[in-house]
Swiss-Prot record:
Highest taxon of source: Archaea
Gene Ontology terms describing biological process: translation
Example GO molecular function: rRNA binding
Region annotated Disordered, chain positions: 1-38
Keyword list, A-Z: Ribonucleoprotein, Ribosomal protein, RNA-binding, rRNA-binding
Any one Gene Ontology cellular component term annotated for this protein: cytosolic large ribosomal subunit
A Pfam family it matches: Ribosomal_L27A
Described purpose of this protein according to its UniProt entry: Binds to the 23S rRNA.
Matches recorded under HAMAP family: Ribosomal_uL15 (MF_01341)
Gene: rpl15
Family of the protein in this entry: Belongs to the universal ribosomal protein uL15 family.
Protein's organism: Methanothermobacter thermautotrophicus (strain ATCC 29096 / DSM 1053 / JCM 10044 / NBRC 100330 / Delta H)
UniProt protein name: Large ribosomal subunit protein uL15
Amino acid sequence: MIRKRRKITRMRGSRTVGGGCSKKRRGAGHRGGRGQAGGHKHHWTWIVKYDPKHFGKYGFKRPQKLIKRLETVNLAYLDEMIPELLERGVASEEDGMVVLDVRDLGFEKVLGSGRITRPVHLKAYEFSRSATEKIEEAGGKAEVIE
């Protein structure tokens, strides 16, 4: 149980209640403005010492239009979905190999996470190196479409 008397009660009758000179409590004048005010003027030495990179531009930002954002899919997901895709008619089976165009599923690039358990002939705009290796290991084919 807390038995400490509140500071405001203890300071009754003291006029400034622990705030020093009464002018110090008025507005933000005593501290030279609020926050970062005066960074170019009277707080310049503070800026130089504690936040030297506050003004100006630093670093490099890649132009957003040069960044390629592709819809990707992993081999594990495709391997899991093959029976359903065959059933729906999105994929077909030719020469004991499942033929699938991943663009029909809304994907543009095939990534190599997971493993593929059957030979597949996949068509996409791009394949990662590991995806190509795994597809060919399983006896399949990775066809890049321009």
